[in-house]
From Swiss-Prot:
Pfam short name (any one): TMP-TENI
Gene source species: Nitrosomonas eutropha (strain DSM 101675 / C91 / Nm57)
GO cellular component terms, semicolon-separated: cytoplasm
SUPFAM superfamilies: Thiamin phosphate synthase
Gene3D superfamilies in alphabetical order: Aldolase class I (3.20.20.70)
Co-factor binding comment: Binds 1 Mg(2+) ion per subunit.
Residues that hold 4-amino-2-methyl-5-(diphosphooxymethyl)pyrimidine according to the record: Q43, Y44, R45, N46, K47, N75, S114, K144
Superkingdom of this protein's organism: Bacteria
Keywords assigned: Magnesium, Metal-binding, Thiamine biosynthesis, Transferase
Name by which UniProt lists this protein: Thiamine-phosphate synthase
GO MF annotations, alphabetized: magnesium ion binding; thiamine-phosphate diphosphorylase activity
């Protein structure tokens, strides 16, 4: 097993994931309100953007994250992590392997992995040096309508088996997040329920209070 550096910040609390928005000003405004609301982690994810737009958006969002001292995780793109010196990378089950990502990024970057509903995948990811794993979707997701469905009792087994933080994802809102936290997840990853809220900052604040 590859041990991550012990001084690395542990993933916990509210983990926000940006929506597929092309307008930089609008996206940054939304990110600002999420950060001001107390989000602990922010993942930049934009499946519709080209490489130039991704770079421009990620640079601006990283500046905001630095103001609030919140780590920025980049979805999928290792080169973008290095180009803007983001704090970490999140990879999906069919993306770059943890071992390849760790070799490319080195030991000082955070690496998270989507494990869907597969505990065995999470065990292998931990052995390969992942800093956290994400399970879900636990509820129907508006962001990924074809997402794998994960049973809530998976969190019980994961908590007993893994030694790295566990993130719950998929259709999470203020009505169902507490049930996941009670089952032992360290963080909840939220996109739709945050960025589509009428008051983004207030929504982020309410999610964050669930961990207090």
């Amino acid at each position: 097993m590859i041990d991550p550096p012990m001084d690395r910040i542990k993933v916990s609390g509210l983990y926000a994931i940006t929506p597929d928005i092309e307008n930089i000003d609008r996206l940054c405004e939304m990110a600002y309100h999420v950060l001001a609301g107390g989000v602990s982690w922010l993942q930049y994810r934009n499946k519709k953007a080209n490489s130039r737009l991704r770079l421009m958006q990620a640079l601006e969002i990283h500046l905001l994250c630095k103001q609030f001292q919140v780590p920025l995780i980049i979805n999928d793109h290792m080169d973008l992590v290095m180009e803007i010196d983001a704090e970490g990378l999140h990879v999906g089950g069919e993306d770059t392997s943890v071992a390849a990502a760790r070799h490319y990024l080195g030991r000082n970057k955070i690496i998270g992995v989507s494990c869907y509903n597969q505990l065995s995948h999470a065990i292998e990811a931990e052995k390969a040096g992942a800093d956290y794993v994400a399970f879900g979707a636990f509820y129907p997701s508006m962001t990924k309508v074809d997402a794998y469905q994960a049973p809530i009792h998976l969190l019980d087994a994961a908590k007993k088996t893994l030694n790295i933080p566990i993130v719950a994802i998929g259709g999470i809102n203020l009505d169902n997040a507490e049930a996941l936290i009670a089952r032992g997840c360290d963080a909840v990853a939220v996109s739709q329920a945050l960025f589509s809220a009428q008051d983004i900052q207030s929504a982020a604040r309410h999610f964050s209070k669930l961990f207090c």
